[in-house]
Design a protein with these regions (language model features):
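N-terminal leader/targeting segments and the immediate start of mature chains
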Residues: 2, 36, 42-76, 218-227
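Bacterial N-terminal signal peptides that target proteins for export
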Residues: 3-30
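Bacterial N-terminal signal peptides
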Residues: 29-39
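Short, solvent-exposed helix-to-loop capping segments enriched in aromatics
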Residues: 54, 129-143
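A generic structural motif
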Residues: 65-71, 94-96, 113-115, 163-165, ...
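Amphipathic hydrophobic-ligand
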Residues: 75-81, 194
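An acidic-aromatic
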Residues: 82-131, 196-197
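Gly/Pro-enriched, hydrophobic low-complexity segments
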Residues: 121, 141-227
Length: 227
């Protein structure tokens, strides 16, 4: 591939970013959405824990911080916020820093709202998921989509390496780490060598979530773009 790599593996576009940057941000959100399904208790076999959680957990919520490092290690970008998910296919991400952005899937469409610019982009969920990790939200088999391998524990965190079987996706691999019964961290390595580290706190599995959290109506005066 001859194109230049994007600035961030899970990018946070500046105000007024181009549509391509928003699409990259959406792909990052899809990755994060699918990772919500991976939070479970750490046992001797973290791979089995992952499979059990995909099967048994129907909803969840957490806070997150995210740091993206460029392939050369010179540039870093940070963001943070909260997320919620509810199977099948519904999720919500509320970014609070460095600026406010809301990403909502109602099970049919995905809405991305830049609050500062009052801009909304929308696309159908089935067009957005494809073979990405977010397909797990649609009930895909984790073993069908990924090769899983337990990795050595480090500093009290148990790790699972998930490598997509399809090689034309948005990332090379991801590592999911558990501490005790809670998701501790996720590392995503994209196809340009950029690495995203996601750290989770206040995770709650099978949480009762208000239905309206997964609904979105564009605010009055918003510029809405169908993709």
């Amino acid at each position: 591939m001859n194109s230049a790599p994007p600035e961030a593996a899970v990018p946070l576009p500046p105000r007024g970013a181009a549509p391509a940057a928003r699409r990259s941000r959406f792909r990052g959100a899809c990755l994060l959405a699918s990772l919500a399904l991976f939070a479970g208790s750490a046992r001797a076999d973290a791979v089995d824990t992952l499979r059990e959680f995909v099967r048994d957990v129907k909803s969840g919520r957490a806070d997150f911080t995210q740091t993206v490092t460029s392939a050369d290690g010179q540039r870093k970008r940070s963001s943070g916020g909260s997320f919620e998910f509810e199977r099948p296919n519904r999720f919500r991400f509320a970014y609070t820093k460095p600026f406010e952005q809301l990403i909502v899937s109602d099970g049919q469409k995905v809405w991305i709202h830049d609050l500062g610019l009052n801009q909304v982009s929308v696309r159908r969920l089935n067009q957005a998921l494809g073979a990405t990790p977010a397909a797990l939200l649609a009930g895909a088999s984790i073993d069908k989509e990924f090769e899983l391998a337990a990795q050595p524990s480090k500093d009290g965190v148990d790790w699972v390496l998930a490598t997509p079987r399809q090689k034309d996706g948005a990332f090379q691999s991801m590592r999911v780490g558990f501490r005790g019964r809670e998701l501790a961290a996720v590392e995503i390595l994209d196809n340009f060598g950029q690495r995203s580290v996601l750290q989770f706190s206040r995770y709650a599995a099978n949480a009762t979530l208000p239905p309206q959290n997964f609904q979105f109506v564009p605010p009055q005066g918003a510029d809405v773009v169908e993709q």
